[in-house]
Amino acid sequence: MKLPIIFLTLLIFVSSCTSVLINGSSDEERTYSFSPRASPFDPRSLNQELKIGRIGYCFDCARACMRRGKYIRTCSFERKLCRYSISDIK
């Protein structure tokens, strides 16, 4: 009878300690520093990311137009605008 009681007591103690440790580690404030020497900023890579996003958005716009059976009329990444033509694809 003593063995199950000791086991349950240890289980409760261990579970309470782990929950305290988990809550303590998640409450810590995390700071991220940027070191230009360690990782230099490359504006061309940012420009490439924007181009990829623009191409991806317009590609999705074109697919949506084709699903409707229409031609693509306007695709504006900056304004998030996708318009298709009135005429159907022949």
UniProtKB/Swiss-Prot annotation:
The keyword Isomerase does not apply. Expressed in the pistil. Detected exclusively in the synergid cells. Keywords: Disulfide bond, Secreted, Signal. GO terms for cellular component: extracellular region. Residues 1-19 form the signal peptide. It comes from the Eukaryota. It is found in: Secreted. This is Protein LURE 1.5. It comes from Arabidopsis thaliana.
